[in-house]
Amino acid sequence: MPASTARRLRVAVLADSDTRWKWGALTAARISSTEFTETTESTEKSDKTADSDIRLDGFLLRGRATPTVRQLKEIGVRADSLREVTAVEFLREMTKETYDVLVLALVGGGVQAMLHGLAHAWQGRPERPVVVTGYVGVVYEKLADGLLLRHGADLVLANSRQDAERFRAVYEGVGADASSVTEVALPFLGGAPYEKKDPYTVVFAAQPSVPETRKDRSYLLDRLVRHARRHPEREVLLKLRSKPGEHTTHIEELPYQKLAQRHDLPANLRLVYGNMGEVLDRTDLLVTVSSTAALESLHRRIPTVVLTDLGVREALGNHHFVGSGCLASWDQLDAGHEPTPDAEWVARQGVAAGSTPSGEGSYATAFGEARERVAELLTTGELPPLKPYYTPVTAPGYLPGVLARHHLAPDGSPLPGAPVADKAPGPVRQIVRRAARGAYRHGVQRVAPVIRRMGEL
């Protein structure tokens, strides 16, 4: 926002998981505050998100992936207020409070439900916030589905030039307004440029749902163990996203912690948690299947490998890295291979500022267009009603189900009996809620794999 802004902006973020809260809160700061125009230090290591330019109110959508206290602490992003809400409770809050900017950091169906719910809640209201949404990382699946579910926001953020081109093509291809697509970058990139460490440290960034099968996940763990034994002079870290019983953006049926119990791990191999930026501070080689951590690593010019052992496949997401120069196998890594990323490919992903021959891709200015668009919309006065592409006319067999999952009718109004919490839950309700979540996670991580294996007999 312009430095001349006379008052502190009020910004709200609604998120449904730990990673989306991190993306949403940091995005809100970057598109609303001049404090983030020039940044060289890691944003992940700083909790300076709710700075003097904005008041940030966080809302965590109640569900299977609602972040735990530990996960929120690990992210390290500070807000002026943060509380858990149901979808209907959040919509009610949006009719009581006045915000300048609202960031919807949700899965696609959640964004669509909130857009329709907000359109209904704000009927006849002369003013409303600028509504922003986007993606938390690499977009490698369900491109059309996810994009059309996000259509209707004032800004649909694309994390790279490549994504912006793809997003506009999808919207224009179905006859939807593509003017909302705005190119930015991932908001959590940063940190000091890479310098070789002693001891040399290899980090495998695990993912909750990729790969999916026990066989493939066991294979990757076995290769990591073999690499550690082959290179006893190296420190080898298995970077885990969540602890057993916790959920993140994706469901993890087979945690690596559980698989690791069957191994006699070498002394130089450790399982670690914590902030990804802090782990990258001590990384010499980042290895992953397709994690967004690869982009964080590339931004800091850390040698980065995207594994090909299980194939280069859309189901794994590593097809996104074709042309990056980072594709390699464990056999190559065991032999000492270090990849050299393609500068043009990296620049198109919105990372590694100034790494291209032409000097394009400045990360410091990556959010300038979004800030300008937000400022322009805030000064236009009354904004038009939200108009998503999906309506009861364009998607009569799809939209009602998307909205019903969030207890909303096809017109965006709350369904009868929709859960709403007008006050903080009492001790009994908190115990019941924790038990219900525990039962769900037990079903996902214990019962579902057994049933799946029985079905394969």
Give the ranges of each region predicted by the language model.
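C-terminal amphipathic helix plus adjacent low-complexity
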Residues: 334-457
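Active-site and donor-binding regions of nucleotide-sugar-utilizing enzymes
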Residues: 9-34, 47-48, 52-57, 61-177
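A short, charged/proline- and glycine-enriched loop
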Residues: 2-11, 53, 194-202, 457
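Conserved active-site histidine-acidic residue motif and adjacent donor-binding/catalytic loop
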Residues: 84-87, 270-278
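A donor-sugar binding/catalytic signature common to diverse glycosyltransferases
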Residues: 273-316
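A nucleotide-sugar donor-handling region in carbohydrate enzymes
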Residues: 152-217
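Nucleotide-activated donor-binding/catalytic signature segment of Leloir-type glycosyltransferases, i.e.
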Residues: 252-274
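Conserved catalytic-core segment of nucleotide-activated headgroup transferases in glycan assembly
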Residues: 23, 189-256
